[in-house]
């Protein structure tokens, strides 16, 4: 069963039936390890990393990350190494098949989303277009 949903300014699309997929989103070991470290620093083991999409950025949509204690009934929850990644259904339709990773390089360390649905991305990698 699918529902039509969209972000402001975007064409409505059928929301994916993520329950029928084994792993609609990949949450890497590297990302899970970093999230686990940050959660331990916060001292709140009930926290999960929420990834979401919102309008904005130089390419039209942008990724957002925040810690969240509350899981909605229709959130997708992906577990890796005991750490939970949450995604709401609206954001999930733009993130199906994506990978959430954490990378460290000479230029810095950051969470990275490799999104096969993005047609273009900006230079910093935090915004994209569909």
From Swiss-Prot:
Named cofactor requirement(s): iron-sulfur cluster
Positions annotated to bind iron-sulfur cluster: 58, 122, 124
GO CC aspect terms: cytosol
Organism classification: Bacteria, Pseudomonadati, Pseudomonadota, Gammaproteobacteria, Lysobacterales
Entries under Pfam families matching the protein: Fe-S_biosyn (PF01521)
Name of the protein in its database record: Iron-sulfur cluster insertion protein ErpA
Keywords assigned by UniProt, alphabetized: Iron, Iron-sulfur, Metal-binding
Subunit structure, interactors included: Homodimer.
Gene Ontology MF term list: 2 iron, 2 sulfur cluster binding; 4 iron, 4 sulfur cluster binding; iron ion binding
Family per similarity comment: Belongs to the HesB/IscA family.
InterPro entries associated with the record: FeS_biogenesis (IPR000361), FeS_cluster_insertion (IPR016092), FeS_cluster_insertion_CS (IPR017870), FeS_cluster_insertion_RrpA (IPR023063), HesB-like_dom_sf (IPR035903)
Cofactor binding mode and count: Binds 1 iron-sulfur cluster per subunit.
HAMAP family: Fe_S_insert_ErpA (MF_01380)
Top-level taxon in the UniProt lineage: Bacteria
Job of this protein: Required for insertion of 4Fe-4S clusters for at least IspG.
GO biological process: iron-sulfur cluster assembly
